[in-house]
Amino acid sequence: MRRLTLALDAMGGDFGPAVTVPAALQALVSYPQLELLLVGNPAAIHSLLVKTDSVLLERLTVIPAESVITSDAKPSQAIRASRGTSMRVALELIRDGRAQACVSAGNTGALMGLAKLVLKPLDGIERPALMVVLPHKKQGKTVVLDLGANVACDGAMLAQFAVMGSVMAEHIVGVTNPRVALLNIGEEETKGLDPIQHAAVLLRDVQSINYIGYLEANELLTGKTDVLVCDGFVGNVTLKTMEGVIRVFLSLLKSSGESGRQGWLMQWVKRWMKRRLMRQFGQLNPDQYNGACLIGLRGTVIKSHGAANQRAFTAAIEQAMQAVERQIPERIAARLDAVLPKSD
């Protein structure tokens, strides 16, 4: 069994080691091939490992880091003062060959900038993108990018995202010849901002991309496309809106009461419908697909939600493992070399 070594930014996110350390231990229990490097304040980390089985501790190493980048820090300032922070040290472990991937729930802008600085983008990629795999109503999955790494994108960047998304759909989701669409305000060719229309022109000329045109946001979970491409501003707003609606819906299902004045048959029908709806919509629970992959780099970086709980952060660790096992950076590099001109 091939060993996998991941670096975890143990101090990042809203809850820091209180979430990342238990999630790390949960992952070690589930995956015997996994080794973890926990980066952060040794005292804070070790205090949560006191009762840990010594067998698990053999696959866990604490890497000291002097400080942490806070969630409210401006990315430019955070990057300038990043030496010795848990986020930067975790990324440097990939660069130095000690880890195969990094998982962080820290400041998104800082992670984006530091990852680009430390790991460097692949040839042919201007800027990496945040990507997530979302379930849809046809029991399949859709790759969506960018989700906030790049607020503004030109047409060439969107085309690069499409190529990377296609690779993810093939090797993570398992789709042959994945359909690619651009998120837009309408399906007509005349609709949309100039960068979207420019990207459409570029994608029509890439024979290895199965470009199907524009898709509106209300089709996000319908399964009409395997890859959905947009700029980071639109993608982030779309994802956060969807997550908020789903969380409210699930909470309403959980809290729906049953009137004692109803007959037993009606109560049974309501309970049956509630369980069925929970099963169907439970797969859309954001905790189950937590972890956006920052793709387009010479290494694997997973961005977890800052507010992730233990279950959600464990899901992000599993995403990192999958990306390493499927050799995603190498496959993206090979595809880019074949279909896109290299940037100057």
UniProtKB/Swiss-Prot annotation:
Annotated localization: Cytoplasm
User: Record's Pfam families?
Assistant: FA_synthesis
Location, primary (coarse class)? cytoplasm
Q: Give a GO molecular function annotation for the protein.
A: phosphate:acyl-[acyl carrier protein] acyltransferase activity
Keyword Kinase tagged: no
Quickly give the catalysed reaction: a fatty acyl-[ACP] + phosphate = an acyl phosphate + holo-[ACP]
Alphabetically ordered keywords of this record = Cytoplasm, Lipid biosynthesis, Lipid metabolism, Phospholipid biosynthesis, Phospholipid metabolism, Transferase
Q: What is its EC number?
A: 2.3.1.274
Q: Does the keyword Metal-binding apply?
A: no
CC per GO annotation = cytoplasm
Picking any one GO biological process from the record gives: fatty acid biosynthetic process
Q: Pathway of this protein?
A: Lipid metabolism; phospholipid metabolism
Q: What does this protein do?
A: Catalyzes the reversible formation of acyl-phosphate (acyl-PO(4)) from acyl-[acyl-carrier-protein] (acyl-ACP). This enzyme utilizes acyl-ACP as fatty acyl donor, but not acyl-CoA.
What family name appears in the similarity comment?
Belongs to the PlsX family.
Subunit? Homodimer. Probably interacts with PlsY.
HAMAP family in the record: PlsX
Q: By what name is this protein known?
A: Phosphate acyltransferase
Species assigned in the record: Sodalis glossinidius (strain morsitans)
